[in-house]
Amino acid sequence: MKHRITAALERFSRAMLAPLTYLSAAGLLLAAGALLTSTALSGALPLLQWGPVRLMGRILYKCLSAVISNLSVLFCTGLAASLAKQEKHQAAFIALMSYFIYLTAGNVTLAELGLLAQPDGLTGLYGAGQTSVLGIQTVDTGVFGGVLLGLLTAHVYDHTCKKAHRGILGGVFSGERWSFTCMAALAAVLGFGACFVWPPVQKAIAALTGSLAASGNIGLFLYGFLERLLVP
């Protein structure tokens, strides 16, 4: 039992590294774009004031910011592809479609209940507990939502991708299409449930961080202790 748990954790840790592998390069390119558009640096280097250079820097910065801002999507597809034992590309594709369903289910639920926050002119959705992912406003679960859906997709896909049904609709709801059908239903339920489950979790996290910040040296000790505890 212990060996199985250890092996599962090792697989999970390796799968988590798959999306992170590219973030170092993305971070460097993002920094390069920021430098090319830096007002302070352009005063010392007149070349950076040239229109094409500034345009290239702005494109580079905006494009890489889009990658960094959508880590949940990367974790969802990356984990599904890494953990699936067969036809990994199919698992990644199903994970991406499931993530769209998850986001939209949350958006529709919030809209129907009148809970959809209105973005502020200055701060946007900051502090509202909601965010916009791929143009869809929903509950802000951060990367947790993507990680959870990626794990579920890999598990469901491995157990359903070979399922064959008989009858008229057997050809439609068999194999990978049955995996997608199962994940579509599960993603919709998760998107709906997140609207009710996640806000209390957000409040608990905010209260915990506020307590640590207000506790002075004790809070610093607890933060450092927990951080070191998580280092493998």
List PLM regions with ranges.
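Aromatic-rich transmembrane-lumenal/periplasmic boundary elements in polytopic membrane proteins
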Residues: 191, 198-232
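Generic detector of multi-pass transmembrane helix bundles and their immediately adjacent loops
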Residues: 148-151, 177-178, 192-195, 232
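Hydrophobic alpha-helical membrane-associated segments
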Residues: 157, 185, 189-200
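Early transmembrane hairpin of solute transport permeases
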Residues: 6-167, 171-173
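Acidic, low-complexity cytosolic linker/stalk segments
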Residues: 1-4
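Residue-level signature of transmembrane alpha-helical entry/exit and packing/kink sites
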Residues: 142, 146, 179-183, 220
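Membrane-interface loop-to-helix entry segments
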Residues: 171-178, 182-185
